[in-house]
Amino acid sequence: MIVGLGTDLVEIARMERLLARHGDRALTRLLHVQERAECPRAPDRAARFLARRFAAKEAAAKALGTGIANGIRFADLQVSHDDRGRPLLNLHGEARQHAQALGATGHHLSISDEQTHALAFVVLESSD
């Protein structure tokens, strides 16, 4: 059964501006420590990377029904990939606790990007 659903669309140029203005401070606030280690250093590639992650985290926060609030931080929502490149969502801290309170036993993440935008879709499901 679906217990949460979220989607988000991010303009990549917005992330370019954010990085130009705030640099590493933005990465520290928005990314999990492992994501920061994976983030490319080239500005255009970093903005695309950040846009995909930001869209995924916003979609996850919407699926949780909280947004980025109530103790849930961007760094609590980590995006990684399996060996085949499938995106994975890892929940930490308050995000994990909130998902458990919803009865979520699994989650699915889809991410896509084109020249100007990144899009993410998250489904939280329970075994009931």
UniProtKB/Swiss-Prot annotation:
For this UniProt entry, the molecular function terms from Gene Ontology, in alphabetical order, are: holo-[acyl-carrier-protein] synthase activity; magnesium ion binding
This protein is called: Holo-[acyl-carrier-protein] synthase
Pfam families reported for this sequence? ACPS
- In which family does this protein belong, per the annotation? Belongs to the P-Pant transferase superfamily. AcpS family.
Q: Where does Mg(2+) bind?
A: 8, 58
Its EC number(s): 2.7.8.7
Q: What does this protein do?
A: Transfers the 4'-phosphopantetheine moiety from coenzyme A to a Ser of acyl-carrier-protein.
What SUPFAM superfamilies does UniProt report for this protein, alphabetically?
4'-phosphopantetheinyl transferase
What does the UniProt keyword field contain? Answer: Cytoplasm, Fatty acid biosynthesis, Fatty acid metabolism, Lipid biosynthesis, Lipid metabolism, Magnesium, Metal-binding, Transferase
The record's top EC class is transferase
State the Gene Ontology BP annotations: fatty acid biosynthetic process
| Magnesium found in the keyword field | yes
Entry's localization field: Cytoplasm
